[in-house]
Regions:
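Acidic, low-complexity, intrinsically disordered interaction modules
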Residues: 18-55
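Charged low-complexity stretches with an acidic bias
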Residues: 51-67
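N-terminal acidic leader/helix
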Residues: 1-28
Length: 67
């Protein structure tokens, strides 16, 4: 899977989540449920888009590197 395919999968996948969630929460939870690397990105790499939407791109990039 290329980075572009991964990113597209994540951005399409979050459409099913609750609308009252921030985008970062959706991205975090989707990657956590499907790829199981979200907490590693959060704790080992210090990138946390759950609380900071401005880190979504960096979070997706870091998660992809761990696949």
């Amino acid at each position: 899977m290329t980075y572009e395919e991964f990113r597209e999968d994540v951005l399409n996948g979050i459409k099913a989540f609750q609308n009252d969630w921030r985008e970062g929460q959706k991205v975090f939870n989707y990657i956590d449920s499907k790829y199981r690397v979200a907490r590693k990105v959060q704790f080992d790499y210090g990138v946390d888009c759950f609380y900071r939407d401005d880190l979504i791109d960096k979070f997706i990039e870091t998660a992809y590197k761990l696949l």
